[in-house]
A protein has these predicted regions:
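Non-transmembrane, membrane-proximal soluble domains of secreted or membrane proteins
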Residues: 1-189
Length: 189
């Protein structure tokens, strides 16, 4: 009475684990591999372009009664036809990186690193948000994703390299001052 159920459970686990690894594992077949480190923080997103040694820090949301401006949202730029390893981390509480068009959502958990592997197949603009209730300004924790041509991506990265504020990789440091870009600027590496 126990042998058959145990065999069924073990076989279902084995097949489920194999399928999950195929779905969530690194993708193949694109022209280029890109790694982007994404930090969730109350209440904004920071993007490290680790291959390029530059970063973008999001300004923390602080509601003042006026509508937010989409132009001020942090934007993650990705080149088209690339395999992207999105490395997810959190500076404070659990957040959830979600771009509905990518059909995948993953939590950012303090002290833990998660990954999302995506392949960028078409140029376009996409909306992203935190999908985990993370505090009083959670609803303002929005970001944009722009999938652009390789030339536009290179131009964007070069513009970041020209600005000393964006040089280096933003690490785990965090200062929770509202309505300020309070993440300390990293030392150039």
């Amino acid at each position: 009475y126990t042998f058959v159920p145990v065999v069924l459970i073990v076989s279902m686990f084995t097949f489920s684990d194999r399928v999950e690894r195929q779905v969530t594992g690194p993708k193949t077949g694109a022209d280029r591999q890109v790694t982007v480190e994404v930090y969730g923080k109350q209440w904004a997103w920071d993007f490290n372009y680790t291959d390029e040694n530059v970063h973008v820090t999001g300004v923390q949301a602080h509601l003042d009664g006026s509508p937010g401006k989409e132009a001020e949202l942090p934007t993650l730029y990705l080149p088209v036809n690339s395999n992207v390893d999105v490395v997810l981390k959190s500076r404070d509480v659990i957040h959830s990186f979600w771009v509905p068009a990518f059909l995948e959502k993953r939590d950012t958990i303090p002290g833990m690193t998660n990954h999302i592997h995506i392949t960028t197949k078409e140029i376009g603009d996409y909306k992203g948000k935190c999908a985990e209730l993370c505090g009083e300004y959670h609803s303002e924790m929005l970001f944009n994703v722009k999938v652009v041509s390789q030339e536009d991506y290179d131009n964007y990265i070069n513009s970041l390299k020209q600005n000393p504020e964006n040089q280096g990789i933003a690490g785990d440091q965090y200062n929770r001052n509202p309505n300020q870009n309070a993440t300390p600027r990293p030392a150039n590496q």
